[in-house]
Amino acid sequence: IMQGGGPAIRGRTYRIFHKHSVDVVVNELVDWAKEGVAQLGCSPCSLVIGIGRTHYEATAMMIEAQVYGDFNVQSDLEKKITDKVNESHVGALGLGGKTSVLATFLKVGQQRASGVRIVSLSPNCCIEPRIASVEL
């Protein structure tokens, strides 16, 4: 990969003390995404995010978001994350530009009342596995 690493080493799974505000989680995710996208060696990417109670659950949610993600169907929160990362003008390959992220796929699992969420984020090249078929 051209500029120093692919999605496998740019992801992150960690806890966020959210103070019962979704904006705290979104801002932390955007900071992580900007850093990962700038170092990603591929064209504009898609962000895949899972939020859960444990590292295992957050990662499972992230994988499920990737499997069922649809570029044409984006929630308001997914659009908000995509727009905030694109406002950084990191661009493809970290070379600058208006489009760093094509879409965000987000899946949130059940939560508990504590002030901590485990978040798993992976900036994926836009050619990561998608559901497709070819008939010959």
Regions found by a protein language model. Give the residues of each.
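Non-transmembrane, aqueous-exposed alpha-helical and coiled segments at domain scale
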Residues: 1-136
